[in-house]
């Protein structure tokens, strides 16, 4: 799920009940680019600024990619809508991580 994708891109493990906005760059140009964990009341604004780029695309959760032009702004904020999920297991988040990732997950449980 989203935890695995974020980790594969160098992002953190975030406990599901934490109400945060998480932005993890995928294949960033700079090795100093890290994940951003923001409180849910913040709005993140990303603006395309380099006129020399021919193609800039935005893809969210693997959905259809949208082409962006120079100066376009994308605002990301917490939705006012809430989705209820069905929990099929009585295992805790850390137990599920441990079953999928083994010892690596135990480092984050403590």
Q: Language-model features: where?
A:
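Catalytic phosphate-donor-binding core of small-molecule kinases
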Residues: 4-110
């Amino acid at each position: 799920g989203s935890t695995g994708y974020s980790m594969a891109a160098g992002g953190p493990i975030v406990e599901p009940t934490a109400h945060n906005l998480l932005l993890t760059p995928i294949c960033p140009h700079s090795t100093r680019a890290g994940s951003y964990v923001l409180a849910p009341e913040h709005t993140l604004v990303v603006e395309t600024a380099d006129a020399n780029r021919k193609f800039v695309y935005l893809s969210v959760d693997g959905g259809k990619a949208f082409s962006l032009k120079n100066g376009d702004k994308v605002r990301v904020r917490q939705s006012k809508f809430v989705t209820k999920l069905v929990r099929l297991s009585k295992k805790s988040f850390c137990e599920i991580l441990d079953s999928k990732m083994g010892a690596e997950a135990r480092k984050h449980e403590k």
